[in-house]
């Protein structure tokens, strides 16, 4: 935009005070209740099971919660970052990478091709999607959280399991490390 030949600075968008109050209330009182099923999972370091077995209902619940967490991290940068760091939820989400169901480990359709693959593989995994987003956001504090909880280890384990397969999960793991190289 220009006014009288001068460029106007682009100011960050300020939310409506009502929206701000709602967001504050949500993250203070509701987020813990919403993500309680994720918080009941063991941290990936203490989970002794090689493969996490769950019922279809549990799997669906965790897929939906991971999708919600992904969208919150994507849309509410500051508040979601504070929630993720203060709640210690990332090591529990990493436990889902041990899931038997691939759709629990990985869910990704960030472009048209991925959206098509999502219909071909309707249960693409949701947990890995969160870690990919945190990497792509290129936030040093988020990277520090991933390193603090040693999240790379379960991602490497999952990658080594899928290494010889030519599937969406294997390609996404390769893309994760390619993005890591670029960051």
Where do the protein language model's features map onto the residues?
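Extended alpha-helical scaffold regions
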Residues: 1-183
């Amino acid at each position: 935009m220009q006014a009288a030949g001068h460029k106007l600075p682009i100011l960050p968008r300020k939310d409506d005070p009502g929206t701000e109050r709602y967001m504050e209330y949500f993250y203070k009182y509701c987020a813990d209740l919403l993500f309680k099923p994720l918080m009941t999972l063991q941290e990936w370091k203490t989970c002794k099971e090689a493969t996490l077995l769950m019922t279809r209902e549990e799997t669906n619940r965790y897929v939906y919660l991971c999708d919600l967490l992904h969208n919150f991290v994507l849309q509410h940068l500051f508040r979601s970052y504070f929630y993720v760091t203060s709640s210690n939820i990332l090591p529990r989400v990493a436990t889902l990478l041990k899931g038997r169901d691939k759709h629990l480990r990985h869910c990704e359709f960030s472009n048209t091709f991925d959206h098509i693959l999502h219909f071909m593989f309707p249960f693409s995994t949701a947990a890995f999607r969160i870690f990919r987003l945190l990497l792509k956001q290129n936030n040093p504090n988020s990277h520090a959280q991933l390193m603090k909880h040693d999240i790379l280890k379960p991602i490497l384990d999952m990658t080594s399991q899928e290494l010889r397969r030519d599937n969406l999960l294997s390609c996404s793991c390769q893309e994760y490390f390619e993005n890591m190289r670029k960051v």
